[in-house]
Amino acid sequence: MKSPKLAIDPEKLRGAAGKAVSTMKVLANEDRLLLLCQISQGECCVSEIEEQLDIHQPTLSQQLGVLRNEGVVNTRRQGKNIYYSIADPALLEILATLYRLYCPKGNA
């Protein structure tokens, strides 16, 4: 049985390949993927993320730094807290696709 073909123009992809590869590298770390999934639910601060994901603060800070440097999250300071949000709506689509493909339908 043949797999369905996708309508992909290799020349168009060539121009976007660098950005696509950068995005995939960001997502290729379990902690960063979980962080992005949490942030995709709405703007949140470090303490909220730490509580929700049980990722220890040093790891959390390191991975949030990578996300900031790659430009995939926006930051906003309010008092002592820094709030994070997803910078690129396309990333939300990628996260939704990953969730749909890899998370069992019976789980919330």
Which residues fall in each region the model found?
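Amphipathic alpha-helical dimerization/coiled-coil segments
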Residues: 1-19, 92-108
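Intrinsic disorder/low-complexity segments enriched in polar/small residues
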Residues: 3, 58, 63-64, 79
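N-terminal helix-turn-helix DNA-binding core of bacterial DNA-binding proteins
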Residues: 11-58, 78, 82-90
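A generic alpha-helix structural signal
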Residues: 21-24, 64, 95
